[in-house]
């Protein structure tokens, strides 16, 4: 009790929100089991302002909701999501933005990180640049903690359940009956893209009542093993630790087997863990060289691969990806395109460009994604599969000049902010 009180006192003195690990709002209520999927269990005004180290956000109101969801074994969970209201916003247009948390630790979750600008929360701070662009369109935004209370990065189906139940909860928050004319678009980058696509795949059976107009995603990861092999011995080697730790959080058999291939590594947010393992050899170094060929490890990874499921999105998908992405191999995108487009009813547009790295690709593709979503609100006709090559996705037709300028200048600002990126090389 003394330690708990001391932590609360310290948090109050420093004027930062309570860490989710000691914040009772993140704990499920006693009536969790009697609630329905998507029910709002608790809600509150955002304890502290949403704060970005890069941009000002056009926010009129911000709330956090706790929503009933479930894990991959259908066990009940309480998921926290953040709802952001823009000035003069249109409540009938909702973006579910899946942040690229990429971390197996609750204190890295978007609901907390967007209130605490720091090196530890840098990935969510960068994502707030994109969220600001969405709010400037007059769209409501919900940002789910889709990894859940156990931080199960990168578990596909639980991510999907959390996303869909957070949308349900947001609609119920504004309309207690849950019946509304709200149109929702899914948006995400990096693993946020994977969560968005899994949500689009399971939605017809899991949440058929939701009116999803489409999913706009960038740099998705169709094959986790190929991703691991690509980032190993590079600046983002630490992501391999986060992937293994996140899967271990969800699957006990995976955790028990992983120990045979190396000691369990510390939990951490994306950038601190990448700094710790900067350019280290992970497979055949930190972990035994045979870790990816072990049947338990391999099977657990495969069930979370987009390429391992025959189910396909039943809503239109816009996917932007650089041919030169240094983290998610473009060959895997082509495999996904072939798999999906071989099936009837798939509506997929791929915007391929020549952005020279993962971060630049995010900024060049996001204005195209927003432009594509704007057309989806208006039910513009789409059909079949389309794959277009461009030098840069800044050249995507119809992008508003102010939107292009906002993302170009934001990219330059992030590149110039060396005091954060330099941390990864120390």
Curated annotation (Swiss-Prot):
First-level EC class: hydrolase
PANTHER family (UniProt xref): LIPASE 5, PTHR34853
MF (Gene Ontology): triacylglycerol lipase activity
Name recorded for this polypeptide: Lipase 7
Catalytic residues in the record: 190, 358
Keywords, alphabetical: Disulfide bond, Glycoprotein, Hydrolase, Lipid degradation, Lipid metabolism, Signal, Virulence
Biological source species: Candida albicans (strain SC5314 / ATCC MYA-2876) (Yeast)
GO biological process: lipid catabolic process
Signal sequence, start to end: 1-15
């Amino acid at each position: 009790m003394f330690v708990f009180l001391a932590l609360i006192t310290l948090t109050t003195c420093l004027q930062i929100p309570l860490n989710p690990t000691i914040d009772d709002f993140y704990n499920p209520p006693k009536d969790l089991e009697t609630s329905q999927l998507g029910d709002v269990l608790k809600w509150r005004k955002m304890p502290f302002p949403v704060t970005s180290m890069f941009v000002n956000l056009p926010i009129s109101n911000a709330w956090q909701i706790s929503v009933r969801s479930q894990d991959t074994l259908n066990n009940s969970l309480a998921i926290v999501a953040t709802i952001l209201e823009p000035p003069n916003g249109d409540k009938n247009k909702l973006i579910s933005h899946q942040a690229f948390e990429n971390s197996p630790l609750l204190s890295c979750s978007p609901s907390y990180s967007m209130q605490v600008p720091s090196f530890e929360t840098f990935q969510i701070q960068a994502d707030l640049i994109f969220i600001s662009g969405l709010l400037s369109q007059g769209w409501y935004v919900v940002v789910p903690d889709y990894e859940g209370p156990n931080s199960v990065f990168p578990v596909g189906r639980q991510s999907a359940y959390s996303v869909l139940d957070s949308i349900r909860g947001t609609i119920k928050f504004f309309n207690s009956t849950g019946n509304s004319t709200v149109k929702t678009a899914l948006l995400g980058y990096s693993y946020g893209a994977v969560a968005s696509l899994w949500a689009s795949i399971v939605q017809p059976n899991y949440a058929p009542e939701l009116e999803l107009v489409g999913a706009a995603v960038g740099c998705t990861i169709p094959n986790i093993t190929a991703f691991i092999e690509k980032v190993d011995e590079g600046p983002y080697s630490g992501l391999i630790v986060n992937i293994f730790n996140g899967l271990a959080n969800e699957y006990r058999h995976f955790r028990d087997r992983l120990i045979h291939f190396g000691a369990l590594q510390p939990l951490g947010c994306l950038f601190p863990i990448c700094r710790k393992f900067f350019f280290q050899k992970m497979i055949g170094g930190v972990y035994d060289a045979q870790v990816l060929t072990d049947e338990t490890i391999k099977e657990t990874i495969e069930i979370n691969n987009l390429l391992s499921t025959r189910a396909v999105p039943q809503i239109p998908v816009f996917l932007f990806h650089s041919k030169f992405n240094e983290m998610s191999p473009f060959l895997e995108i082509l495999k996904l395109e072939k798999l999906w487009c071989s099936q009837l009813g798939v509506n997929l547009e791929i915007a391929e460009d020549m952005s020279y790295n993962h971060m630049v690709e995010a900024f060049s593709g996001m204005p195209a994604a927003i432009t594509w979503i704007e057309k989806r609100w208006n039910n513009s006709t789409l059909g079949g599969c389309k794959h277009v090559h461009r030098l840069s996705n800044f050249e995507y037709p119809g992008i508003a000049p102010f939107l292009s300028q906002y993302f170009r200048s934001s990219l330059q600002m992030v590149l110039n902010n060396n005091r954060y990126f330099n941390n990864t090389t120390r």
